[in-house]
Amino acid sequence: MSAPDKEKEKEKEETNNKSEDLGLLEEDDEFEEFPAEDFRVGDDEEELNVWEDNWDDDNVEDDFSQQLKAHLESKKMET
């Protein structure tokens, strides 16, 4: 085979490889259809309590706050 013939064969192989690659890319572009789900099914159930009802207590004189105040007062006197 002569050099020009070898070059033509290489070009044909490269063209074939490119067309195969394009075929694979086109398959990736398709979107998969999923069935629609009905999310309202759980609406009939009783609502769950996600957080504690007493999270926003106005009780600032609880045991922790008293201990903290006492600790801070003792630190003030030490310095």
Swiss-Prot record:
Domain of life, source organism: Eukaryota
InterPro entries: DSS1_SEM1
UniProt region (Disordered), positions on chain: 1-30
Modified residues (Phosphoserine): S19
Keywords from the UniProt entry: Phosphoprotein, Proteasome
Gene Ontology process terms (BP): double-strand break repair via homologous recombination; mRNA export from nucleus; proteasome assembly; proteasome-mediated ubiquitin-dependent protein catabolic process
Gene Ontology CC annotations of this record: cytosol; nucleoplasm; proteasome complex; proteasome regulatory particle, lid subcomplex
Listed Basic and acidic residues bias regions: 1-21
Pfam family, one: DSS1_SEM1
Assigned protein family: Belongs to the DSS1/SEM1 family.
Subunit structure as annotated in this protein's UniProt entry: Part of the 26S proteasome.
PANTHER family, A to Z: 26 PROTEASOME COMPLEX SUBUNIT DSS1, 26S PROTEASOME COMPLEX SUBUNIT SEM1
Role summary: Subunit of the 26S proteasome which plays a role in ubiquitin-dependent proteolysis.
This protein's name: Probable 26S proteasome complex subunit sem1
Originating species: Drosophila melanogaster (Fruit fly)
This protein's encoding gene: Sem1
